[in-house]
A protein has these predicted regions:
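Consensus "Asn ladder" position of solenoid repeat domains
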Residues: 2-3, 30, 35, 63, ...
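Short glycine/acidic-rich loop motifs that flank beta-strands on beta-rich extracellular proteins
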Residues: 1-19, 25-28, 41-47, 74-81, ...
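Right-handed parallel beta-helix
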Residues: 20-22, 53-67, 72-76, 98
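Short, T/G/N/S-enriched strand-turn elements that build extracellular solenoid repeat scaffolds
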Residues: 31-35, 54-55, 76, 80-82, ...
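Intrinsically disordered, low-complexity Ser/Thr- and acidic-rich flexible linkers and loops
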Residues: 6-22, 48-59, 147-164
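Acidic, glycine- and Ser/Thr-rich low-complexity intrinsically disordered tracts
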Residues: 17, 139, 149-155, 160-163, ...
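Internal alpha-helical scaffold/solenoid segments in large eukaryotic proteins
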Residues: 83-110, 114-121, 129, 187, ...
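Solenoid scaffold repeats with emphasis on beta-solenoid/beta-helix
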Residues: 21, 29-30, 37, 42, ...
């Protein structure tokens, strides 16, 4: 806890890449469970490493983060990029981003509690992600997914990998008192099913190419009580 720099309360909160837990350079097959990792620039900073950035191969993969507290970070409760991991039953509260998962793939976000984050889950260029059974409460935006056309020219990674934003399942989550549940930009083949929405200002905001977008709420499967339902295209 309390490993933070670049922070002045109410004035400046960049974090400057300080972190409670740093994992990088092909750090794989670890279990991180039952820890308090709060009030740090990032709670967790997980990065695949320079070799992955140059070659598009490898990653900091197949780690399990279970029942930890990643709260009160001025930047990201969890930052996990260019890798494949599982985040299960964690507490993620009052961060700028609860999870920042840029370029993550084949990852699972299961049974976590997100509360009062600016963006609870933010993933750019993500692929094959499962967001299942989480609770989002009081977040400004619960889930934001997107693709940027322009990527840094000095990165080898996008030269060797498909970096489209695609293939998400958002299943059985509860959204309570969030301003926006799903913001989806240039992301293909997202299926949202069996989620519940209570006192949510806007359910979805879609833009760009969202081919294959499906949202299913079967009668009796979930209670939907939006304050102002809106779909923007």
């Amino acid at each position: 806890d309390w490993n933070v720099r670049g922070y002045s309360h109410r004035f400046y909160n960049r974090g400057q890449d300080s972190a409670g837990l740093l994992m990088y350079e092909q750090s794989c097959f670890n279990v991180v469970a039952h820890n308090s990792i709060t009030h740090s620039g990032d709670g967790l900073f997980l990065w695949a490493g320079q070799s992955t950035m140059d070659s598009g191969k490898g990653g900091a993969n197949d780690n399990l983060f279970y029942a930890n507290d990643f709260s009160h970070a001025p930047t990201n409760g969890i930052e996990a990029t260019f890798s494949r991991n599982a985040f299960v039953a964690n507490r993620v509260e009052e961060n700028w981003h609860g999870i920042w998962g840029g370029y993550s793939y084949q990852s699972v976000i299961l049974g976590n509690t997100f509360r009062n984050n600016v963006e609870a889950i933010a993933i750019e260029h993500g692929q094959d992600i499962r967001i299942v059974g989480n609770r989002f409460e009081g977040d400004t935006a619960a889930i934001r997914l997107w693709w940027n056309k322009l990527e840094p020219s000095d990165w080898g990674y996008p030269k060797y990998r498909d970096t489209r934003s695609r293939d998400y399942v958002v299943l059985g989550n509860s959204f309570v008192g969030t301003r926006l549940a799903l913001r989806v930009d240039n992301t293909q083949r997202l299926r949202a099913e069996g989620n519940s929405f209570t006192r949510v200002d806007s359910l979805t905001r879609l833009s760009g190419d969202t081919t294959g977008w499906v949202m299913v709420q079967r009668p009796g499967e979930a209670t939907t009580v939006p304050a102002r339902p809106r779909v923007s295209m």
